[in-house]
Regions:
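Short beta-strand-turn/beta-hairpin segments enriched in glycine/proline and small hydrophobics
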Residues: 1-11, 28-44, 69
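Short histidine-centered loop motifs in beta-beta connectors
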Residues: 8, 12-18, 22, 51-54
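Short, well-structured beta-strand-loop connectors
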Residues: 18-29, 56-65
Length: 70
């Protein structure tokens, strides 16, 4: 099981995956917004999304788990 974590303090702007989706290494899974900049969050390995831990509008801190992959 792998996790995708936030690299910065931000707000979740858009979630691009849902539970059960298959993602490949490098796919963008969500977009964060910080200081009016859009920050793409990419999968660092391939897998199936088992849980999306956040929803649009949520505030996240550096290191928060955003998505879990199987």
């Amino acid at each position: 099981m792998a996790t995708i974590e936030s690299d910065t303090v931000a707000v979740v702007w858009k979630v691009l995956v849902a539970e059960g989706d298959t993602v490949e290494d490098g796919d963008t899974v969500m977009i964060l917004e910080s200081m009016k900049m859009e920050i793409p969050v990419e999968a660092e390995e391939s897998g199936t999304v088992s849980k999306v831990h956040v929803e649009p509008g949520a505030s996240v801190a550096e290191g928060d788990v955003l998505v879990t992959l199987d």
